[in-house]
Amino acid sequence: MSGEWGHLGQTLIWAVWVLAAATEGPAADAPVRSTRLGWVRGKQATVLGSTMPVNVFLGIPFAAPPLGPLRFKRPKPALLWNDSRDATSYPKLCLQNSVWLLSDQHFLKVHYPNLEVSEDCLYLNIYAPAHANTGSKLPVMVWFPGGAFETGSASIFDGSALAAYEDVLIVTTQYRLGIFGFFKTGDQHAPGNWAFLDQLAALTWVQENIEFFGGDPHSVTIFGESAGAISVSGLVLSPMASGLFHKAIMESGVAIIPFLRAPDDERNEDLQVIARICGCNVSDSVALLQCLRAKSSEELLDINKKTKSFTRVVDGFFFPDEPLDLLTEKTFNSIPSVIGVNNHECGFLLPMKEFPEILGGSNKSLALHLIHRVLHIPNQYLYLVADQYFYNKHSPVEIRDSFLDLLGDVFFVVPGVVTARYHRDAGAPVYFYEFQHPPECLKDTRPAFVKADHSDEIRFVFGGAFLKGNIVMFEGATEEEKLLSRKMMRYWANFARTGDPNGEGLPLWPAYSQSEQYLKLDLNISVGQKLKEQEVEFWSDTLPLIMSMSTAPPGPPVPLLSLSVLLPFLFSSAP
């Protein structure tokens, strides 16, 4: 892929521009940097509590617009541009149902810029300390946003505070979503995984251009939350990504999370939906692609709302095998990693969108019904789940709490721990955390029983309390929360610098060894050991073993990793 992107003609033209810069020079009122495709003119920003200005470059194209004949194809190189490109405006969102973002702003007390949507969306944003220039060789951190692979944007995250306080370069990038990012025909004509290939294109752009912004292409850390973390985990597993990054941080998401693979019957159902809505011939892949490429983006969005299997696939290229098999075979990129979860991943935000009635309390009958519906566990095995989670639990509140813990375990904690073990056993340095602090600013927008919910840590990682721009990520942070945020920014940046999050003035974060120590990120940071040991054993060993030995109609051999689950509410994109 890199040969296509490092086109000789583009390099020669870029060299001419560099020579011209020696006589012209940048304007004094805005930062200007060269890229291999042309010049970009950004703007400067400042953050609270720091004297270091930040150069901000928004909407830099890393690939050609995936329009018309490029729809459902690998991304192509971006085209050269003349003059200096304005990089002061946010790029458009990739096509999605933007109503989801609006609802998240209310529940999470955040604010995003007013952004339009477009199929032309393969852009990235860069936040660099103002002193950074060619030769600075600062660590680079590339952020992949979450959103269930259905929603999200690079431009709802502001990297200014992290760049200013920690002297690192932050890149936030976009990728195609939903049907645009994952449609596949099941053959060579459209193998799918376009979103992951977009991410490869962005990382290739970083390798070829980030030094002109002061970054070190040999020190690139990829990080993300939820679907973004799943992307990071997938990139670590993919042979196509080898050499494009050097460290990885996965916040509340890994590639073996159950819902990521849709069964064949659901794919077939979706093809019938496509045929009904668009009138396309679904029996011929070439004709189907030609038909879909001629449809409007609105028509495809309509399909997206009525289907459910636009997910990752083993394509033989990006994923040569199932993620669990790649982990088992130790054929992945063995690099330092941070993996973590929050202590109430399904406390409010995710269940509120799917079954809000459970939040007030539940009984065992309703809880088991929902477990069967959501997890597809056969009825004859539900008693095992009940014994594990509801034994000696009688009140509606106790049952609700156990049910929400169960969801968090299945979709986040257990996959995270299992992945960390595979990385550790492959010889790669691993650091594990559990984030435990519920933001004070959210106490009046969600129930009192909610602890650190899904995505709560993002505002701390990005230093949201120190931002001054039109992206509001952490309004009303307490002084203690600001201190925790500073510590988390330092941990993350130290890891990006050296592959080890530890440093002067920080509580020790032990590596994830056979003793399975992990860091408890709270106002008072401490060390824990063997996170959810019994629950991990139940889902990864006990239940699969009993199901495999049973004479009952066979269920999935490893329910944790092969459940056919599609939760459209999962992986909200917001901080």
UniProtKB/Swiss-Prot annotation:
Record PTM text: N-glycosylated.
Catalytic reaction(s) noted: a carboxylic ester + H2O = an alcohol + a carboxylate + H(+)
Organism domain of life: Eukaryota
Disulfides per UniProt: 94-121, 280-291
Alphabetized Pfam families for the sequence: COesterase
EC class: hydrolase
Record bears the keyword Electron transport: no
Main location: secreted
Subcellular location: Secreted
One GO cellular component, as annotated: extracellular region
Signal peptide extent: 1-27
Assigned keywords, A-Z: Disulfide bond, Glycoprotein, Hydrolase, Secreted, Serine esterase, Signal
PANTHER family per record: CARBOXYLESTERASE (PTHR11559)
Function: Involved in the detoxification of xenobiotics and in the activation of ester and amide prodrugs.
Name used for this protein in its record: Carboxylesterase 5A
Organism: Canis lupus familiaris
